[in-house]
C-alpha cells in the first residue's frame, strides 16, 4: 500500500457496514459507514476539481467544526490529489484569538491556498483576497445534489507530500510539518502494534480531527485495521465527559484511542461528582493510550475511581510522540506494565540521574515505554550521545520522521541533521531501555547556575496542595535590569477562598518550594 486513499477503498469493500459513529450529546448520533464515507468523499473530490477548479497538489486548509464535515473534506482532498492542511475551526468574530492568529500565520507561510471554513464572515474576508475561500455549507449542498460523476484519482508516490499539519509544539511560531504517505502509513503500522489492535476491536475517542492524535492515531488507525470508530465530538466531551464512559459501556469498547492527561483529569472530576455510574461496565477495555502532554506521576492514583467500574490498570498506556514524527515514538507495551521511576532531586537539578532509596528527596516520572519498531531514539547532550541514566535532549530517526517544515529551511535545518530530529524534549533511558520524559529544553528554569524543570515543581505543588490548587504552572524570564532569571508561579484554585486565605496559601507554597529546591518564586 503506497497511497492513503487505498485505506478507505479497502475498508469500503471489505467491511462496508462498519464505519464511524459520531456522538453529539445534544443531537442524535450519526453513523457513517465506510462505504458511505468513500462515496461522499469521491463526490467531494469531483466538486473540488470541477466546481472550484482545484488542481492536484493544491494546498487546502480545512478549518471546520463538525467532525463529519472535516473527515469528508479530508478524504475529498486526498482523492482529488490535493494536500489537506489541518487547522482548528476559526471564528472571524474572534480575531484576537490564538486560533485566528495561527490561521493567518499559516496562510502567510503556505502562499496561495484554498480555505474551507464554516464561518461565513471568515469566508467573506478571505474570498476578497488572492486566496480562494469556500464555505463548507456550499460544498455539502452540492454533495446532496450531485448524482452522476466520474473521478480520476491522481497517482501519488509513497514519498510524496500527503498532509501539512501546523504545530508549534510547546514553543515558537506555528510551523507546517510536512508528512508523506509513507510517514503516515508506517506510523499506523507501529501504532497498531503498540495498541494490540485486531479486527474484532472497537475504538472510541474524543480528540479533534485537526490533531494528529484524532486523525492519525484514531481515525486512520481504525481504517487501517478495518474496525468501527466511535467519535465523540470534542465539545460534547467537554460538556459531559461521562459520555465517554457511557459509550464505552454501551458498546463494550476495547480500545480507548489517544487521550490527554488533562482530559482524563476532567473525566475523573465529573466521575467523583456523579452517582449515576454504578451500572457502567469498563471491563472490556484492553488499551487506553495517554499522550500529547506530560503525564503526572500521580495519574494512577487519580484514576482509581475507574478501577471500581472494572477498568484494568494495565490498560493504561502512556506514550510519547509529536507531529514531527507523524504521531507515536514510544509506548508502554503489553507485558511490560507501567512504571514510575524515582530519582534524586538534588542530583537531577545538576543534570545527573541517580536512583533513590525511600529516605531521599526524589522526583518521580512516568515511563513513556519502549521505542517502537522502525524508530531509533538517542539522548544527546552538547552534541554527544549519552549512555543510559544520563539526561539530555531526545533525538529521533526513522521512516516516520517528517521531511521538514513547509517553506522554512532555517527551522528545518535547526532540527534535522543527518536524519536525526532534535525534539527539544529532555529525557533519559533507564537500564532496561525504558524512556522517560522530564520536560522541554527551552522551558528549563536556571537559578544560581542550576537547572530546574517546571514539570517537577508543578508536581510537587499539586501533591502538597492538591485540595486547594487545581492547576499550576512555573515559568521564568530573564531580567536585563537585574541580570538574572525571575521565577513566576501561576495557579488555579480548586475551591473558593478569601483574599486572606489566598495570601496564606501563596506563603505556604513559597515556603514549601524554597524548602524543596532552595528558592521561592518572586511572583
Give the location of each predicted region.
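AMP-binding/adenylate-forming catalytic core of the ANL superfamily
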Residues: 256, 398, 403-404, 426-518
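Conserved pre-ATP/AMP-binding loop-to-beta segment of ANL
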Residues: 16-18, 147-166, 172-173, 183, ...
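Conserved ATP-binding/catalytic segment of the ANL
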Residues: 365-389, 393-454
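Conserved AMP-binding/adenylation subdomain of ANL enzymes
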Residues: 185-202, 212-257, 269-270, 274-275
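ANL superfamily adenylate-forming
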Residues: 96, 100-104, 111-158, 165, ...
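Gly/Ser/Thr-rich phosphate-binding loop
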Residues: 253-258, 270-361, 376, 383
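Conserved AMP-binding/adenylate-forming core of the ANL superfamily
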Residues: 20-54, 58-67, 71, 92-99, ...
